[in-house]
A protein has these predicted regions:
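Loop/turn-to-beta-strand initiation segments
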Residues: 42-46, 121-124
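N-terminal glycine-/serine-/threonine-rich phosphate-binding loop
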Residues: 1-44
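Internal active-site segments that recognize and position negatively charged phosphoryl groups
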Residues: 112-164
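Gly/Ser/Thr-rich active-site loops/lids in small-molecule metabolic enzymes
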Residues: 27-29, 67-79, 144-156
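Alpha-helix C-terminal capping segments
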Residues: 39-40, 81-91, 143-151
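Short, active-site-adjacent cap segments at secondary-structure transitions
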Residues: 14-16, 52-56, 103-104, 132-133, ...
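Ligand-binding beta-strand-loop-alpha-helix segment within the catalytic cores
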Residues: 60-124, 139
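Short beta-strand segments
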Residues: 7-11, 49-50, 97, 126-128, ...
Length: 166
């Protein structure tokens, strides 16, 4: 089956490499080069990235769950900005979308805007999860995949399958 459009889910932990937290630039640059190789084959790529290299709401017993999930959403934005910039370094054009206004860092998500970005040959990042607490980035992955009519979801994470709870 020829795939024209895919949605890639990267775990935040994948960005940390052996450091387990933050970013490991060599690891992320290698991932960016692999993404570019797929893109160079003519495949349109959407990407959702988790925030687990910075924050996991379930690890805090003192912070309100809504606030914890908001911190997680912000972590996904940081991850998308970082990976997007390394993808640009490899020669790709990128765009980052969020489900809520995030100043000049991202564009507000709409299917029409995303379709325009794909038509312009851009790699599209979906940051901020669903924009609502209590939903993992795995939920956001499936939601965005359906919305963009992806041919497949590709998972690059340290867990077999998807989270059905956090």
């Amino acid at each position: 089956m020829e795939m024209k459009r895919v949605l890639l889910k990267l775990s935040g932990e994948a960005l940390a490499g052996p450091k387990k937290t933050g970013f490991d630039e060599a690891t992320v640059l290698a991932v960016a080069k692999q993404i570019k190789a797929i893109s160079d084959e003519g495949v349109q790529i959407g990407i959702v990235i988790g925030g687990g290299n910075f924050w996991r709401g379930r690890t805090s017993e003192t912070i309100d769950r809504n606030k914890a999930d908001q911190i997680g959403m912000l972590a996904t934005i940081m991850n998308c900005i970082y990976v997007s910039d390394l993808c640009r370094y490899t020669g790709m054009k990128t765009e980052i979308y969020t489900p809520f206004v995030c100043g000049a860092f991202t564009k507000l998500y709409s299917k029409d805007s995303v379709e325009e970005s794909f038509a312009q040959g851009k790699l599209v990042f979906f940051a901020g999860g669903t924009g609502h607490p209590y939903f993992s980035t795995d939920t956001a992955t499936v939601l965005r995949a359906v919305e963009i009519e992806a041919d497949a979801i590709l998972l690059a994470k340290a867990v077999d399958g998807i989270y059905d709870s956090d």
